[in-house]
């Protein structure tokens, strides 16, 4: 992969009041600041993973140092912290800014389109007559099922990417997320320090976080419609994939740490994280007592904060149980 500026890196330039010269700086994710030359500044500013560095000999001499100073990625496999790794599928180049109007249009249409497709698909499934007759031994086409499921996970992240570009986020890449060697989903990486817009409204943040859920709802509707129109041999597979998309939408809507629902709710309330706010209010003895002194309102807030923590526990247990089942089935299949 061509060099890509890391998501936690920021670039800046300052005009020296004494000399009148412009000085260029780069700061990495661990807050180390380096002064760099103008040519390197411009090369890093344009390092989006889609082309070589705009330096002599494509910057081959300086790339090892830039990697060592935690300024660029050159491998598709990146360490995201702890046991988490990402595999970059799609570097999002800077040229997407040229068609930002298209992304704005798609983002504006997505909430309504997702609802209309889902209502249409659900109506057809509940009240329509299936086209054709199911075969006697109806079964799921495994390869198609997994292909559509992985596409649905990727589509969720493309929804975030679309909203991010529309609102002026510096979207870097779309990739697959791993814990160790186990794939657990997909992700979109953004460099908020280098975003083209500095202040985002609550409405923009909420839509950014909900756009992935909306994409899955729309996908579920499309699959339900397709199961009605296409060959009945495919119907069960398409319906099962629609169910997966509905499950993804519901799961991501929950207010658990790291999920879109928690981030959207936090943006709505104007705080960094409702999960950590719940922890602070319930685990801090003085805050907890202060809440309970406010009568019904205080008890309601305590119950709300408690439900956030319970949701977090249930989501973790659900994910772990699914991986236990997956490992068990894999071992059983092998042996």
Model-predicted segments: where are they?
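Long, low-complexity, charged/polar intrinsically disordered regions in eukaryotic proteins
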Residues: 1-28
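Hydrophobic transmembrane alpha-helical segments that form the core helix bundle
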Residues: 200-334
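Topogenic membrane-insertion module of multi-pass membrane proteins
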Residues: 73-154
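Hydrophobic alpha-helical transmembrane segments
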Residues: 56-66, 84-97, 149-163, 182-192, ...
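Small-residue-rich helix-interface/hinge motifs
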Residues: 79-83, 142-195, 267-269, 273
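Helix-boundary and loop/linker segments of multi-pass membrane transporters
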Residues: 133-139, 192-200, 237-240, 294
